[in-house]
UniProtKB/Swiss-Prot annotation:
Catalyzes the reduction of all-trans-retinal to all-trans-retinol in the presence of NADPH. SUPFAM superfamilies: NAD(P)-binding Rossmann-fold domains. Keywords: Lipid metabolism, Membrane, NADP, Oxidoreductase, Transmembrane, Transmembrane helix. GO terms for molecular function: all-trans-retinol dehydrogenase (NAD+) activity; all-trans-retinol dehydrogenase (NADP+) activity. The keyword Ligase does not apply. The lineage of its organism: Eukaryota, Metazoa, Chordata, Craniata, Vertebrata. It is a multi-pass membrane protein. It comes from the Eukaryota. It comes from Mus musculus (Mouse). Substrate binds at S175. It is an enzyme of class 1 (oxidoreductase). InterPro entries: NAD(P)-bd_dom_sf, SDR_fam. This is Short-chain dehydrogenase/reductase 3. The gene is Dhrs3.
Length: 302
């Protein structure tokens, strides 16, 4: 028993060195990309914003079928028609992911009409942009139901079949606010932090599930209607991301089987700073960068 324990202690650091070296080499050499030609992709919140750009990106890269879920039929119709004109089979279903029964019902309808889903992109989200004391209780609940619990329901609906097929990918379009919250968006930050923990646990739980993996994307502020009006102190230094950039990098991560993606890459520094700086220093960074007051001009949509 002692020798086995000592052997494990010796092997473990060697494994770490190998894995770090492998990752470093992978950053230099072009990785092997996943072929999407046989994949059926379902995108929640797929009618507009990042969801629409994700549909375009998957279609351009040869996805076999694309399914869009959302609450606004007009937007879903527009995106569906655009994807069909690109030559890709596309369907849409009106579905509120915050409604568990509706998710399970629509998932059944998708399987009957379209077939098996092999890539699930949890993109749907809402934000109300208020402090805790200014927030309506129902609005707070809605954020948790859509942004967090909605991912529980969609994943439970589609993951079992992926495991049977030994082919699947769960994608979470999260936010860097999951790691660094700001005032004025307490509902959104809380729900995104919870969704991040959900994906972290799910990703580890899939380690011994061949052919099935997960990707979490944490982008900085993106120039969509959702956060319209949000302003940082130095917009030229911290410009918002373009939704097409987020979509492109997300599909890259799926094809490369990348578990975690922060956008832009400088957001990785945020993790380091939060682990080494005292709270007072972190608070001063929020004041200096303008994130402390960036939601004061918020006009976005829910």
């Amino acid at each position: 028993m002692v020798w086995k324990w000592l052997g494990a202690l010796v092997v473990f650091p060697l494994q770490m060195i190998y894995l770090v070296t492998k990752a470093a080499v992978g950053m230099v050499l072009p990785p092997k990309l996943r072929d999407l030609s046989r994949e059926s992709v379902l995108i929640t919140g797929g009618g507009r914003g990042i969801g629409r750009h994700l549909a375009r990106e998957f279609a351009e890269r040869g996805a076999r079928k694309i399914v869009l879920w959302g609450r606004t039929e007009k937007c879903l119709k527009e995106t569906t028609e655009e994807i069909r004109q690109m030559g890709t089979e596309c369907h849409y279903f009106i579905c509120d992911v915050g409604n568990r029964e509706e998710v399970y019902q629509m998932a059944k309808a998708v399987r009957e009409k379209v077939g098996d889903i092999t890539i699930l992109v949890n993109n749907a989200a809402v934000v109300h942009g208020k402090s805790l004391m200014d927030s309506d209780d129902d609005a707070l609940l809605k954020s948790q139901h859509v942004n967090t619990l909605g991912q529980f329901w969609t994943t439970k609906a589609f993951l079992p079949r992926m495991l049977e097929l030994q082919n699947g990918h769960i994608v979470c379009l999260n936010s860097v606010l999951a790691l660094s919250a700001i005032p004025g968006a307490i509902d959104y930050c809380t729900s995104k932090a919870s969704a991040f923990a959900f994906m972290e646990s799910l990703t580890l739980g899939l380690l011994d599930c061949p052919g099935v993996s997960a990707t979490t994307v944490l982008p900085f502020h993106t120039s969509t209607e959702m956060f319209q009006g949000m302003r940082v102190r130095f917009p030229n230094l911290f410009p918002p991301l373009k939704p097409e950039t987020v979509a492109r990098r997300t599909v890259d991560a799926v094809q490369q089987n990348q578990a975690l993606l922060l956008l832009p890459w400088t957001m990785n520094i945020l993790i380091i700073l939060k682990s080494i700086l005292p709270q007072a220093a972190l608070e001063e960074i929020h004041r200096f960068s303008g994130t402390y007051t960036c939601m004061n001009t918020f006009k976005g949509r829910t």
